Swiss-Prot record:
Signal peptide: none annotated. Gene3D superfamilies: Hotdog Thioesterase (3.10.129.10). It catalyses: a (3R)-hydroxyacyl-[ACP] = a (2E)-enoyl-[ACP] + H2O; (3R)-hydroxydecanoyl-[ACP] = (2E)-decenoyl-[ACP] + H2O; (2E)-decenoyl-[ACP] = (3Z)-decenoyl-[ACP]. The gene is fabA. The active site is at residue 71. This is 3-hydroxydecanoyl-[acyl-carrier-protein] dehydratase. Pathway: Lipid metabolism; fatty acid biosynthesis. It comes from the Bacteria. Keywords: Cytoplasm, Fatty acid biosynthesis, Fatty acid metabolism, Isomerase, Lipid biosynthesis, Lipid metabolism, Lyase. It is found in: Cytoplasm. It comes from Blochmanniella floridana. Its EC number is 4.2.1.59, 5.3.3.14. Belongs to the thioester dehydratase family. FabA subfamily. It holds the Pfam family FabA. One of its GO terms (molecular function) is trans-2-decenoyl-acyl-carrier-protein isomerase activity.
C-alpha cells in the first residue's frame, strides 16, 4: 500500500524508479543517470498558481555530474532538455501520487523559455510545478506550468507541460 506523503527523499525516488513506490501498475521515475531530482520538498492537491496542485523539488548540483564532461568540453553546462525532462518527471510522479495507474509518457509542452543556465559552480536547482488541470478518465493526464530555478533565480519556464499515464503502452 502506497504511503502518501508531502515530501520524498532520494531513497523514495530511487524506489519509484524500481517500481516499488506506487505498486506494479503505477508510474515510475527514471533511474540514475536520467533521474534529475534528489528530493521532493512539497506536494499538495491544491496550491500552486491555479490552486489545482503543486510540486516543489530539488537537485543538488555537483561539478562531476555526467553531463558536464560532454556538454560541452571546456564549456560545461547542464543541457536544458534535462531540466525540461525533470518537470515532466514530476508531473508523472504527481499523477501516481494522486492514485493514477499506468506508465508515464511526456505528451508535449506548449512553450519553453531559457533565460539562464546551470553551471558546475551552481549549488541547487529547484523545480516548481503548478497544475492547471488533471484528467482522470480512460487516459490519466496532467497539465501544468513549470519553473526551474538555479540558486533561487528563475532560469527556465515551461507552459502547458503534458504527461499521460498509459495502461497499454503499445497504444501510445
Amino acid at each position: 500500500m502506497f504511503n502518501k506523503q508531502e515530501f520524498y527523499t532520494k531513497e523514495d525516488l530511487l524506489n519509484s524508479s524500481k517500481g516499488n513506490l506506487f505498486g506494479k501498475k503505477g508510474p515510475v521515475l527514471p533511474a540514475p543517470n536520467m533521474l534529475m531530482i534528489d528530493r521532493i520538498t512539497k506536494m499538495t492537491t491544491n496550491g500552486g498558481n491555479y490552486n489545482k496542485g503543486f510540486v516543489s523539488a530539488e537537485l543538488d548540483i555537483r561539478s562531476d555530474m555526467w553531463f558536464f564532461s560532454c556538454h560541452f568540453i571546456n564549456d560545461p553546462v547542464m543541457p536544458g532538455c534535462l531540466g525540461l525532462d525533470a518537470m515532466w518527471q514530476l508531473v508523472g510522479f504527481y499523477l501516481g501520487w494522486i492514485g493514477g495507474k499506468g506508465r508515464g509518457r511526456a505528451l508535449g509542452v506548449k512553450e519553453v523559455k531559457f533565460t539562464g543556465q546551470i553551471l558546475p559552480t551552481a549549488k541547487t536547482v529547484t523545480y516548481l510545478i503548478h497544475f492547471r488541470k488533471i484528467i482522470t478518465r480512460t487516459l490519466i493526464m496532467g497539465m501544468a506550468d513549470g519553473e526551474v530555478m538555479c540558486d533561487n533565480k528563475i532560469i527556465y519556464t515551461a507552459a502547458d507541460l503534458k504527461v499521460g499515464l498509459f495502461t497499454n503502452i503499445s497504444t501510445f
